[in-house]
Swiss-Prot record:
GO terms for molecular function: DNA binding. Residues 1027-1111 form the PB1 domain. Belongs to the ARF family. This is Auxin response factor 19. It comes from the Eukaryota. The lineage of its organism: Eukaryota, Viridiplantae, Streptophyta, Embryophyta, Tracheophyta. Residues 1-20, 573-598 are annotated as: Disordered. Auxin response factors (ARFs) are transcriptional factors that bind specifically to the DNA sequence 5'-TGTCTC-3' found in the auxin-responsive promoter elements (AuxREs).
Length: 1161
């Protein structure tokens, strides 16, 4: 008995052989298959199994003899139809007694190859069984678990030059080096003789030579004979295999071509269908063996399924409409690829002949319709169900991004990703530990997209961010969801607008002064009409702890000044040490030993001061606890004291600002005088600063005397809880501490001043200062607020000065101001304060793991006309802040300004904004609001009094600043750690705006073009940044980052990337499936990874992209524009804030969701 259908076109994407009349006649004769068939009459040599499977394809796997299989006669009939390219006619009789599937015992399997076409097929002898033993079942399960070993082979599609009679066969270099024996390059030219055996054990001899320009591997002598003997044409494929015995094997795979006209003597396809069905029905009725022929290249799919595979697929999966799945397909040159699809229906393929059949009863839709022709019906054992839906972007409930190691796949976060989002990687899915099966049903892509759009807002805001709100300082926030919070913010915004609170009016309306005083005083939420029981606040220890940082508004002025004075002394010493160490590198080598004793003395003095501060801190904490209890007892009396508290705060802020400016100028004088060489050009500047210093000292003494006379009666009469006299030594010690604190912040900020910058603060009138929620941040020229560089990249960017008119003087020197060094308004008649330019190399790098966020705002009428900003804060423009996942430049001047300008909710609500959920955000100093008597809680319970960087989740590493501020001092003013760690970086991003801003949701993006484009000034150029971690992107997966310094070569990098994205083995060169690794260098050029030397690659790489074969093909067609190859359904990157629907991207956020690689640096 001969074989059937060995050369007909198979289903796409696999190719099949050409059809000949002789082969068609053999296939027709093989249709009449009965019981007890014996196979071919002539004795044929054994077929090499490795070569047979290589020619059959990577997806073909035959069950072993003696195992249980499930035979589908419906699939067998489809093989005949595919071979004849003709469907079953209506007059073919049906067999009602023939079930749709037969459980059979596979007696033997014989491999065959057509002697004329070399097409492979298999002969199987089956016997239906009603019961089976354990041995057959175990053998079937064992065969399912055992994988066929990977053979060394390469496959090439022949070109026209390869099949020409006068040419040779060009072998790819890597294939020749891997499969062929090595050449002797001492010969000229290098050449050798190769022998290869085909499926019929015929030996073919070729001459392998390395020649040409450029040089290449060629098979010359003997190749033309092989092409003519096998009747090969362009489009056919040849396969070279090296078996276990290191012998070369040679096979062919013919291209899919239209069949020629069939002779009239050949049996019709209907007869073939009848013969197949009749043989199966007879065997099922008598339990007798029967023989079938399986042509893997002609059959659309396997119709003899291992019993264990069938059981696992049918009973291990819960199939439902909308379920997502993967399916493996063969690609060109024996490659494989998984395609994603969705189950759209479950119905019978042929409800008339095969009712309730499981053969291809699943209707599916494919995600990529243009990737190749695929069937719209599949069987359940062909697919791999995915246990979760496909989100365009997952909900942003993950924590901050951290440096990842090579073994990150075993970490807790990676396991969470694999369990929650298996659709992100091609190899990630949820499987049952026993059956290794996906078990959870899903929905279709469109349904899940609609569900995500409708429910993501409420789910993310109410379910997750409500947890973050519980960690804030005020206990009332525990009962507020995100939606309620947004409504209250909008309500407050409308209320302020109704009361004529405007930023651009010269003066505030008189009717809103009580509201302003209320905002400045920072009264807790329960005093504003919100239902909260005072008893709960008194008896709840956690609430008392959360209110600890904000209770300092009860401290007298003497204590605040004492804290500032002590801080100034501490930082003065530290600044001198930093200046000595920075100037040491500029002086000759002989002067270096002279500086060492000075540094040692400064360190000793600093240690003594830290010990004294620790003792003072303990005493101060006791006093704060007493004051806190007094505050709780006087809650009912507090509304009557609002006006006095507001007046006290205005005067207190005035004193703080003057003292800070005075100390800053003194430190600048000392730093200039301590320099070894003072140029003649700097002498006039020093003299001018000395004059200003004398004026400031005189004004400060006068203002302090006046303010103390005004404040003491108010404190003694209106605030009984604050007039408790402290011992004189106790008052003096905190006063010294306050001076030291401010000096430390002033000089530390100077250490971060970039080169060629100077401070020019033009003061306004000498009225008391009233700060707003925006005055804690420096005015900038729309400077990007983040950096991805540990160097001083951001420091070199100059900021615009704050210009104002004084009624007693004219405007002077309009040079640029360093970041956060200039306050928005100065409440005294100071003329100007200038800072000496300092080279950045003299500044110590103290800020390697601190995030910088600056709210950019501008004065509307800078330097024009006379304005009074006492009760009219300057208008501000809103610019979204962003943070990156790497180290950034920190301007310590931010801390300087925050110390002197505590935030308030003055006539505007706090505006929150999205921040990237994977961003590492740190706080510069959490004690900014605790020194000057400002309640840190706004009307809604948010810590309003914090500085810019205090609003974020983590603090500076204590180890970096042990020599600057003691741990006890820092902890006394720090937000409780449990509350601080729970603040969501996606909810709080340090963004503030004007009161007329539209605010719809706490998690929404402000996309008002008119508001964002309010300024007519051109945007600043983006900053150049350097990365310590490199971003990696792959389609369908979230972006990752890796540390290039951990690898020593390309092989380690590829292995790590394969593990990171669960594509082990697919990035190897021997796979030849088209995967490419490309990267963008510092010149924004797209290059193939692996061409440059490793050291040069590490120095210039900016981001890496893993491209699939389809993306590589798209790049070849559309040009090398990597930015346009990101699909619209790209999974959202960890650095885009978790918002897949954002219409725009910050220029420096590095967000891949906007579909452009131009943003990646």
């Amino acid at each position: 008995m001969m074989k059937q259908a060995q050369q007909q076109p198979p289903p796409p994407p696999a190719s099949s052989a050409a059809t000949t009349t002789t082969a068609m006649a053999a296939a027709a004769a093989a249709a009449v298959v009965g019981s007890g068939c014996e196979g071919e009459k002539t004795k044929a040599p054994a077929i090499n199994s490795e070569l047979w499977h290589a020619c059959a394809g990577p997806l073909v796997s035959l069950p072993p003899a003696g195992s249980l299989v499930v035979y589908f006669p419906q699939g067998h009939s489809e093989q005949v139809a595919a071979s004849m390219q003709k469907d079953v006619d209506a007059h073919v009789p049906s067999y009602p007694n023939l079930p749709s599937k037969l459980i059979c015992l596979l007696h033997n399997v014989t491999l065959h190859a057509d002697p004329e076409t070399d097409e492979v097929y298999a002969q199987m002898t089956l016997q239906p069984v009603t019961s089976y033993g354990k041995e057959a079942l175990q053998l079937s399960e064992l065969a399912l678990k055992q994988a066929r070993p990977q053979t060394e082979f390469f496959c090439k599609t022949l070109t026209a030059s390869d099949t020409s009679t006068h040419g040779g066969f060009s072998v790819p270099r890597r294939a020749a080096e891997k499969i062929f024996p090595p050449l002797d390059f001492s010969m000229q030219p290098p050449a050798q003789e190769l022998q290869a055996r085909d499926l019929h054990d015929n030996v073919w001899t070729f001459r392998h030579i390395y020649r040409g320009q450029p040089k290449r591997h060629l098979l010359t002598t003997g190749w033309s004979l092989f092409v003519s003997g096998k009747r090969l044409f362009a489009g056919d494929s040849v396969i070279f295999v090296r078996d276990e015995k290191q012998q070369l094997l040679l096979g062919i795979r013919r291209a899919n071509r239209q069949p020629t006209n069939i002779s009239s003597s050949v049996l019709s396809s209907d007869s073939m269908h009848i013969g197949i069905l009749a043989a199966a029905a007879h065997a099922a009725a008598n339990n007798s063996p029967f023989t079938i022929f399986y042509n893997p290249r002609a059959s659309p799919t396997e119709f003899v399924i291992p019993f264990a595979k069938y059981q696992k697929a049918v009973y291990g999966n819960q199939i439902s409409l909308g379920m997502r799945f993967r399916m493996m397909f063969e690609t060109e040159e024996l490659g494989t690829r998984r395609y994603m699809g969705t189950i759209t229906g479950i119905s019978d393929l042929d409800p008339v002949r095969w009712k309730n059949s499981q053969w291809r009863n699943l209707q599916v839709g494919w995600d990529e319709s243009a990737a190749g022709e695929r069937r719209n019906r599949v069987s359940i054992w062909e697919i791999e169900p995915v246990a979760a839906p496909f989100f365009i972007c997952p909900p942003p409930f993950f924590g901050a991004k951290r440096p990842r190691q090579l073994d990150d796949e075993s970490s807790e976060m990676e396991n969470l990703l694999k369990r929650a989002m298996p659709w992100l990687g091609e190899e990630i899915c949820i499987k049952d530990p026993q059956t290794q099966n996906t078990i959870m049903p899903g929905l279709s892509l469109v349904q899940w997209m609609n569900m995500n759009m409708q429910q993501s807002s409420s789910f993310a805001n109410t379910a997750m961010q409500s947890e973050y709100l519980r960690s804030l300082s005020n206990p009332n926030m525990q009962n507020l969801g995100a939606a309620d919070l947004s409504r209250q913010l909008c309500l407050q915004n409308q209320l302020l607008q109704q009361n004529n609170i405007q930023f651009n009016t010269p003066k505030l309306s008189q009717q809103m002064q009580p509201v302003n005083e209320l905002a400045k005083a920072g009264i807790p939420l329960n005093q504003l009409g919100v239902s909260t029981k005072p008893q709960e606040q008194i008896h709840d220890a956690s609430n008392l702890q959360r209110q600890q940082p904000s209770m300092n508004h009860m401290l007298p002025l003497s204590q605040a000044q004492t804290n500032l004075g002590q801080a100034q002394v501490l930082v003065q010493n530290q600044m001198q040490q930093q200046h000595a160490s920075s100037t040491q590198g500029q002086q000759p080598a002989t002067s270096q030993p002279l500086l060492l004793p000075q540094q040692q003395q400064q360190q000793q003095q600093q240690q003594q001061q830290q010990q004294q501060q620790q003792q003072q801190q303990k005493l101060l904490q006791q006093q704060q606890q007493q004051l806190l209890l007094q505050q709780q007892q006087q809650l009912s009396k507090m509304p009557a004291q609002l006006s006095s508290l507001a007046n006290q705060q205005f005067q207190l802020t005035d004193q703080q600002l003057q003292l800070q400016l005075l100390q800053k100028l003194q430190q600048q004088q000392q730093s200039l005088l301590s320099q070894p060489a003072v140029t003649l050009a700097q002498l006039p500047l020093i003299q001018e600063q000395q004059k200003l210093l004398l004026d400031m000292q005189q004004q400060l003494s006068n203002s302090q005397t006046l303010s103390q006379q005004q404040m003491m009666p108010q404190q003694s009469t209106k605030v009984p809880s604050q007039n408790t006299p402290l011992p004189l030594p106790v008052q003096q010690e905190p006063q010294q501490k306050l001076l030291q604190k401010q000096a430390m912040l002033a000089d530390t900020s100077e250490a971060a001043v970039p080169p060629t910058t100077s401070v020019n603060v033009i003061s306004t009138t000498g009225s008391p200062l009233m700060t707003t929620g925006a005055t804690h941040s420096v005015l900038t020229e729309e400077i990007p607020s983040c950096s991805t560089s540990p160097s001083t990249a951001n420091g070199n960017h100059l900021l615009q000065p704050i210009l104002g008119r004084n009624k007693h003087c004219s405007m002077i020197n309009t040079e640029k101001v360093p970041q956060s060094a200039a306050p928005m308004s100065v409440p005294s008649s100071l003329e100007a304060v200038t800072a000496t330019p300092r080279m950045m190399k003299d500044s110590p790098k103290l800020n390697h793991n601190v995030k910088q966020s600056v709210v950019a705002s501008k004065l509307a009428n800078a330097g024009t006309g006379s304005q009074n900003y006492v009760n009219n804060p300057p208008p501000t423009d809103y610019l979204e802040t962003a943070s990156s996942a790497t180290s950034v430049w920190l301007s310590q001047n931010d801390g300087l300004l925050h110390q002197n300008f505590p935030m308030s909710n003055f006539n505007q609500p706090q505006m929150f904004k999205d921040a990237p959920p994977d961003a590492e955000i740190h706080a510069a100093n959490t004690s900014n609001n605790a020194l000057f008597g400002i309640n840190g809680d706004g009307p809604l319970g948010f810590p309003i009094g914090l500085g810019t960087d205090d609003f974020l989740s983590n603090g500076i590493d204590a180890a970096k600043y042990e020599n600057h501020i003691s741990t006890e001092i820092d902890n006394s003013y720090r937000i409780p750690k449990d509350a601080q760690q729970e603040i969501s970086s996606s909810m709080v991003s340090q963004s503030f705006g004007a009161s007329d801003m539209a605010f719809n949701s706490i998690d929404s993006t402000i996309n008002d073009g008119g508001f964002l484009n309010r300024s007519s000034w051109p945007p600043a150029a983006p900053l150049k940044r350097m990365r310590t971690f490199t971003k990696v992107y792959k389609r369908g997966a979230v972006g990752r980052s890796i540390d290039m310094s951990q690898f020593s070569g390309y092989d380690e990098l590829k292995h790590a990337l394969a593990r990171m994205f669960s594509i082990e083995g697919q990035l190897e060169e021997r796979q030849r499936i088209g995967w490419k690794l490309v990267y963008k260098d510092h010149e924004d050029d797209i290059l193939l990874l692996g061409d440059d030397p490793w050291e040069e690659f590490v120095g210039c790489v900016k981001c890496i992209r893993i491209l699939s074969p389809q993306e590589v093909q798209q790049m070849s067609l559309e040009g090398c524009d990597l930015g346009n190859n990101i699909p619209p359904n790209q999974a959202c990157s960890s650095s885009d804030g978790g918002n897949a629907w954002r219409a725009r991207c910050d220029q420096n956020s590095g967000n891949p969701s906007n579909g452009s690689y131009e943003q990646f640096e």
